[in-house]
Amino acid sequence: MKLYSINTGHFKLDGGAMFGVVPKSIWNKLNPADENNMCSWALRCLLVEDEGKLILVDNGMGNKQDEKFFGHYYLHGDDTLDKSLAKHGFGKDDITDVFLTHLHFDHCGGSIIKEGDKLVPAFKNATYWSNERHWKWATEPNAREKASFLKENILPIAESGQLKFFNVNGQSSGVSLDAANTNALPSHDSCLTTHDSHLISNLSFYSVSGHTDAMMLPKINYKGRTIVYMADLLPSAAHIPLPYVMAYDMFPLTTLNEKKAFLTEAHENDYVLFFEHDPLIECCTLQQTEKGIRQNEVFKLREL
């Protein structure tokens, strides 16, 4: 097996939204904001080469949205998906599978490209993987989350015939958060469960539902270590402390429970955490401190 970090650029999000109830006087020391209160975040994907497959985990924001859209998110940096793939000797046509942790625009925007007036898969030889629960959540979005689920990123995947679903068992949230149901929020318990991907023998995944329903976190056995792609359960190393939960999360108390369960397991088993959005830290391990579980060693994926 070979693993490659695939950087697709950086973007900006409001620091308050990214750190939730944590005061700016604290989080601003971790990721300093600009004059508009915006912090810079990475769009870091993962490429897995194993058993004759080339699996891309997430694919960034893409480039098909208009200037106004990108103006909201300040896409910046020299890295692109194409450049980063080429750096390792690959192109989009080499990708056999695209593993979508979830369908927010900054994770799946590179799935679809424009060819003239048509929207077509960027990875023409690949199978795109989601799960039925999350697909339904994304294609029938609640009003709070709707702006993150862009139809042009999602629907053409199904229309292409290249979409398949992983089997994610367990109880769904069972709720629509539209205006008619705002008083019907459920008790949303922790859903940290592990599933076999059946793609390659060394790849399984967690499903978690605090950030969005049935998000998937790849769990990879590599060189005797376990690497977990954190997606938006822990978007950065700064989010390791339990109260550091994004305001974007649909069910923050569920996130809190999922983080606690995951961090305990990860610390006990010396997992390597791979961060999708940390602007500086690619990977870290964990240690127990007086304040709880915190980051320990920090390193690049290629150093493993």
Each language-model region and where it sits:
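Zn-dependent metallo-beta-lactamase
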Residues: M1-L56, M61-Q65, F69-H72, N169-G170, ...
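Residue-level marker for buried hydrophobic side chains located in beta-strands
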Residues: I55-V57, F99, Y128, I227-Y229, ...
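Short amphipathic alpha-helices and their capping/turn segments at secondary-structure boundaries
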Residues: L43-E51, S84-G89, K118-V120, L217-V228
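Active-site gating loops and adjacent loop-to-helix segments of metal-dependent hydrolytic enzymes
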Residues: V22, E67-K68, L233-D249, E290-V298
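Metal-dependent catalytic neighborhoods of phosphoester/phosphodiester hydrolases
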Residues: C108-K118, T285-L286
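Metallo-beta-lactamase
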Residues: G62-N63, Y73, H76-D79, S84-F90, D94-D106, A122-S187, ...
